[in-house]
Amino acid sequence: MRVRRLSLITLSIFWSLFLPLSSCFAAKNEIPLKEGAWNITLQINPPTSDFLPIVQMLCLSQTEPVPIPAKKEGCRLLTKEIEGNTVFWVAECREKEFVTRSVGNATYDSNKVEGAVQTMTSATGKETEMRTYTLTGKRQGNCR
């Protein structure tokens, strides 16, 4: 009887200590992204004077962490995966004469982000153009 009582006490102590910690180890699909307005810069790699950096303000959140303007007409997000602090994606934009597919990753650290985007643009009757961009960004405040 005494052994059983000790094991019940041990078990209850274990659960009282473990349960509060279990949320720390639970598999979450959240990244350390502070939601709000983000200033995102895409710089072609290697940098050239022919291509100026692309700078845009985007509203990012846990549900929309991909730092690309997916709401642009003709653009859609094909896949999105989150691993640790990093979001990986594949997106596609279709316009009249060409299709651009981008494969990217962005690693968040609360108020900043770094990553890379590779684009492949194909147009009817032309060679596919491939470009690689370095992605950087900082949170600027709340979305408007």
Give the role of each language-model region:
Residues 24-37, 81:
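N-terminal helix-cap/turn-to-beta initiation motif at the start of protein domains
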